[in-house]
């Protein structure tokens, strides 16, 4: 029987199958192979007479996140508030970079639309849309935009990510219709949210699954080669092969088609500046965790 791990606590794993939910333990062979079952894993299980099960096989993972420890994510809803806390554009770009690297479809949800006059005219919206990403506007407290999020979840294994205080837990509670996740208050001193989510669990919503991100995701460029970075910017792709020099990093090289596109306004200046920031970090040998 096949299913998906929705929760793991103290060596027990809860597997959602077509026949229902089963509590399972993992075979010892996984320990020998240094393979630990993760939430999101697609697995094969055997059920005993007491309706308990054993995980016999873990299928190959499409991707794997460390924080939260979740595998096979197909879509990320990146939640940022327009204000309280204010948007950190570098951080938003870093989330997008990680999504591209892990082959995760990214949708950007801007929450707290009531705090700005005209959400669609905010510069950050223009920057994100120019890169080809879908944008959803939310007032999660009032329930505005929640149905659009619900629609996006269908058929996907989804993760909500973004900075603390942006409204991730509020969104989950609205989607599920009950307080599954504790919501944190914004600290007046820091204007940042006190992070409150403490565990990873898949919640079934519509025809998909949703996991909230416990803690801040670990964002690192350590595993990304400098030559790979250009491919993580969707707006660069159609220009990359037109450059005069093979291996062009679109940095200081002449006859660069990406830089020409930038000059013509086809690539947003702030996205290109972020790209150069990452390239320079790699050239200096820095692999900072952000």
Swiss-Prot record:
Zn(2+) binds at residues 243, 248, 250, 256. CDD domains: S1_YloQ_GTPase (cd04466), YjeQ_EngC (cd01854). Its cofactor is Zn(2+). It is an enzyme of class 3 (hydrolase). GO terms for cellular component: cytoplasm. Disulfide bonds: none annotated. Gene3D superfamilies: Nucleic acid-binding proteins, P-loop containing nucleotide triphosphate hydrolases, Probable gtpase engc, domain 3. Binds 1 zinc ion per subunit. This is Small ribosomal subunit biogenesis GTPase RsgA. Its main location: cytoplasm. Signal peptide: none annotated. Pfam families: RsgA_GTPase (PF03193), RsgA_N (PF16745). It comes from the Bacteria. GTP binds at residues 111-114, 162-170. One of several proteins that assist in the late maturation steps of the functional core of the 30S ribosomal subunit. Helps release RbfA from mature subunits. May play a role in the assembly of ribosomal proteins into the subunit. Circularly permuted GTPase that catalyzes slow GTP hydrolysis, GTPase activity is stimulated by the 30S ribosomal subunit. InterPro entries: G_CP_dom, NA-bd_OB-fold, P-loop_NTPase, Ribosome_biogen_GTPase_RsgA, RsgA_GTPase_dom, RsgA_N. Its EC number is 3.6.1.-.
């Amino acid at each position: 029987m096949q299913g998906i791990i929705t929760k793991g606590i103290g060596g027990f794993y809860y597997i959602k199958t077509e026949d229902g939910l089963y509590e399972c333990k993992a075979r010892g062979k996984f320990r020998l192979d240094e393979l630990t079952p993760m939430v999101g894993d697609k697995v094969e299980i055997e059920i005993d007479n007491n309706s308990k099960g054993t995980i016999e096989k873990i299928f190959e993972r499409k991707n794997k996140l460390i924080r939260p420890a979740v595998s096979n994510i197909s879509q990320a809803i990146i939640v940022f508030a327009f204000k309280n806390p204010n948007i950190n554009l570098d951080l938003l770009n870093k989330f997008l970079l990680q999504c591209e690297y892990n082959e995760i479809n990214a949708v950007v949800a801007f929450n707290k639309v009531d705090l700005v006059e005209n959400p669609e005219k905010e510069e950050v919206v223009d920057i994100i849309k120019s890169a080809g990403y879908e944008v959803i506007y939310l007032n999660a407290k009032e329930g505005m935009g929640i149905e659009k999020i619900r629609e996006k979840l269908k058929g996907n294994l989804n993760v909500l990510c973004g900075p603390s205080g942006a409204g991730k837990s509020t969104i989950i509670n609205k989607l599920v219709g009950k307080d599954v996740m504790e919501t944190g208050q914004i600290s007046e001193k820091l204007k940042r949210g006190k992070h409150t989510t403490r565990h990873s669990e898949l919640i079934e919503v519509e025809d998909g699954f949703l996991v909230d991100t416990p803690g801040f995701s670990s964002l690192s460029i350590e595993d990304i080669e400098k030559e790979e970075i250009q491919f993580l910017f969707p707006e660069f792709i159609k220009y990359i092969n037109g450059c005069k020099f093979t291996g062009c990093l679109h940095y200081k090289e002449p006859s660069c088609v990406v830089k020409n596109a930038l000059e013509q306004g086809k690539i947003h200046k702030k996205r290109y500046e972020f790209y150069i920031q990452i390239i320079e970090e790699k050239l200096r040998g820095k692999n900072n965790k952000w």
